[in-house]
Amino acid sequence: YVTREGGFMDVKGLCKFEKAETQGLAVHPQTGEIFFCNKSGGYIYRFNGPDYEDYEPLFQINRADKIDTRMVFNPEGTALFVVVCNRHCIYKVPYNALTHTFGEPELFAGGWDESGYVNGSGVTARFDNPRQPAFDQDGNMFVPEYGRHTIRKITPTGEVSLYAGLPGQAGFTDGLPEKARFNKPECVTVYLDNSLYVADRDNHLIRRVTVE
């Protein structure tokens, strides 16, 4: 990990995992607990510290291994959202910060192993290789869609819509969200003014989507 005080250059070790393909990382917004996922086994782990190997396995998503994941907590810290990239869906896992325990994972948006592009409510929506999401201050989730070159928006109630880009059209175009073009967006984050920053992977750029 790196720190702001160190100019994001003071790289330090935190956790050493014995298996390859460790993917997906989330920090609880209130407690600071750190969670990560391993692709080969499919388990979500909690890092307890202080030693490198102080971690514990917690649960799998859909009892599956070989899953490529990205994770984020909602702003309240009451749920962990797990994007299963190579299964084209998003799971919601309730979390109790007082007892430090998770509930049962439940499918929140998209369909397991059902790739496509469909807007709509929750499990009726379809994604194509969604990646690292982020929340705004209103509880909306923004999901970069690597396979369709778009940014999707999911409301707190699970309504999925197109936020920016044109489905299936890779490119580089600035402008209004519906006219913008991306090329395999990988990650998003939301700034304090609700501006959305996009890691536009195959354009080798960081893009900014502003709220007018």
Can you say where each PLM-predicted feature lies in the sequence?
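Loop/turn-rich, solvent-exposed surfaces of beta-rich toroidal or solenoidal domains
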Residues: 131-153
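A short loop-to-beta-strand structural motif that recurs across blades of beta-propeller domains
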Residues: 1, 42-46, 88-91, 149-153, ...
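Blade-level signature of beta-propeller repeat domains, shared across WD40, Kelch, NHL, RCC1
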Residues: 184-212
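Short loop/turn segments immediately following the C-termini of beta-strands
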Residues: 38-40, 85-86, 95, 146, ...
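Conserved beta-propeller blade signature
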Residues: 33-36, 79-82, 140-142, 195-198
